[in-house]
Amino acid sequence: LRTVPSRIALILAQPVGDVEKVVYFAGYVVKSVNQAAKEEILFNLDSEFKAKVKSATDEKTQDRLRELLTATKKEIEEIKPTKIFDELTYHRYAMKYGTCFEAGIGADALYEIFKNMDLKVIEGEIVKQLEKCGALEREKAEKRLSLIRAFQIAGIRPEWMFLTTIPVIPPG
């Protein structure tokens, strides 16, 4: 975690500070997203928006509703696996959209994410990302891709970076 660059943060494509917040119980990481529930929330949001726009009489109210719809959709689309939220944001999202995602806190949550990680899928996503990214993003993506490929070549699973059993040598 504390190495420079942090391999855990590099694989997650998150800043080291955010990953440290999760490990030290100050932040939450999204472990999984329920796409069906997410789509249902978006559908209900659209239908509610249409009903409220019909009942709104003045243009100012309709514009405010459109802005609110855009902001809410942006919040929902922001919920993706490995996304890290601070405590306040997590609690707000859990109250609003709790059915569409599962989040965790601590190194155990990160371990679970790494345990369920498929390196070939991540490699494919990074290759697609490299085709359409800028110079600054390209450098980070290439570092991430080289790490993923090194793990695959060496036959290393990502969850092996976590100590689950601490070896103790008894005295004398």
Label every PLM stretch briefly.
Residues L1-G172:
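Conserved core architecture of multi-subunit DNA-directed RNA polymerases
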